[in-house]
Amino acid sequence: MPLVLMTDARKADWAAAARRLPRGSVVVVRGQDSKKRLALAETLYGIAPLLIADDPALAARIGAAGLHLPEKRMKEAAHWRARFPHWIVTSSAHSLRALMGAHALDAVFLSPVFATTSHNGAKPLTPLRAAFIAGHAPVPVYALGGVTAQNAARLAPSFSGIAAISSLIP
């Protein structure tokens, strides 16, 4: 099952994590601080294909493989696809209703499937509910949120892959 490494603001050896990914994996470069996001993207460029989160200008500037949009910007996918037809365009989603607007995307990251420390207090969808949602999606769906090597086996075949943070960093 393909893997996606999602970065966040924590100090971690993201380059080492990216190098450990199996062939065909992708890294989504996220972060609120634009300077830190740029530095991280430059560090990771060439290690694995990069999707830049919520920053199309940076994605174009560094020659990223694509763009990752937050759920609230999912409707922009068709615009960015028209401007950059070679890009992979993804988005986050947190419900079945959100996924119904995903037609112009290449994939969606459905979260949180399990309880996760990166979004404390967020109610997990549960593997059963998440599988139901993924099974009705118009595009491939990746499970995100609290996914570990131990609980990944609980994910249904309706998922196209797994996206993770903590379980993929050394």
What are these regions (language model features)?
Residues A143-G146:
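Alpha-helical hinge/cap motifs
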Residues L125-R129:
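Short, glycine-/small-residue-rich phosphate/pyrophosphate-handling segment
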Residues A115, T148-A149:
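Nucleotide-sugar-dependent glycosyltransferase donor-binding/catalytic pocket residues
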Residues T116, P140-V141:
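Short, flexible coil/turn micro-motifs enriched in small/turn-prone residues
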Residues A115-A122:
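Short, glycine/charged-rich beta-strand-loop motifs at protein surfaces that mediate ligand recognition
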Residues D106-F114:
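Non-cysteine beta-strand/loop elements that form the S-adenosyl-L-methionine
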Residues M1-A77, R81-A107, A122, F132-V139, ...:
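Conserved N-terminal beta1-alpha1 strand-loop-helix module at the mouth
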